[in-house]
């Protein structure tokens, strides 16, 4: 199954191969990038933002996750401006997750 068809099936709610090579690789990439992001706590904002831009579909300005942030893929997550997530945020993005502007997310 082509990558485009696989993602279309995911987003439409149809059955798809969750263990396809692409999805396994994207999960691994998400693990590495979230680990990197979580380990940069206290580093310059630009360093942390660059990691989020590699991981997530789209982010606005002033986006912050307290450690430990986790997601399944990252490519289905869009976040607006002025976002804060408290510790241990987990986003399972087998489908689109869209968060608007001026959002505080906490336990």
Spell out what each predicted region is.
Residues 1-62:
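Terminal amphipathic alpha-helical/low-complexity segments used for targeting or macromolecular assembly
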